[in-house]
Amino acid sequence: CDFMEGGITPEDAVWAAKRLESAGLDLLDISGGFGGYTNPGHMEPGYFSPLSQAVKQAVNIPVLLTGGVQTGTDAECLLEDGKADLIGVGRALLKNSAWAKEAITAVQTM
């Protein structure tokens, strides 16, 4: 879903994901914002999670979710809720080089 009026819908994304899987793709990365469009008003951890969850339910290959994940706890909760198989972290890691170490500690104390 590209969040543009008249753009790609979640149903379109699921259709494409199934075709990509059939073509031999090994992993799907659900992300966005790099083309200039974001999901207005939705900045919660894993803000593309409705889309990643729909795709995950439709395919048998791993689905990676990127977007809005700031902490290890955010990542773990998204995984536990079945939103994705893997979590991508971008800006949070760029802001804090110790992010991975802190994420491990946070998840171990959950």
Segments and roles (model prediction):
Residues 1-110:
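Flavin-dependent oxidoreductase catalytic cores
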